[in-house]
Amino acid sequence: MHTDYIHIILADDDEDDRLFFTDAFSELKINTKVHTYNDGVELMNYLNSDEAVLPQVLFLDLNMPKKNGIECLHEIKSNKKFDDIAIAIYSTSSSEEHIEETFVSGANIYIKKPNDFDTLKKVLSDVVAINWQYHTSGLNK
């Protein structure tokens, strides 16, 4: 998919974290469209719908009610339709066990949620810049 913006989705049950995330993107000088979902069930219902616009980057919180980030990751990785989505786990956990499990399950990157806004903007900017280079260079084929 070639667009002039990067479509980003965040699934996170914490409203403050969702606002922090969208505010950070609104301050970055990167052309993005950001959509958020409250939990894994809501996210997967959207991704599996006929009207879904698949994101280039999907940020998944690990600990969500109904369907957690690992369950979403497994479901996404089991469907070829989602092969081009870069998946970033976005969590408060820095447990090596959690980190290893996410990479073994197919995540592309693991991000520990930053405590301050400037660090969050830097991390998100770096992730999007790497993804943008990947997609615009044709490496995703």
Residue ranges and their predicted role:
Residues 36-57, 121:
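Acidic, metal-coordinating helix/loop segments flanking the phosphotransfer/catalytic sites
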Residues 64:
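Receiver (REC) domain active-site loop signature in two-component systems and cognate sites
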Residues 39-42, 68-74:
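Acidic catalytic/metal-coordinating carboxylates
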Residues 1-9, 15-30, 116-141:
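Non-catalytic signal-transmission and effector/linker regions of two-component phosphorelay proteins
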Residues 58, 110-111:
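Two-component signal transduction core modules
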Residues 56, 84-94:
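A short, hydrophobic beta-strand element within the central beta-sheet of small alpha/beta folds
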Residues 3, 19, 23, 71, ...:
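Alpha4 helix (beta4-alpha4-beta5 surface) of REC/receiver domains from two-component response regulators
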Residues 12, 60-61, 91:
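Active-site residues of response regulator receiver
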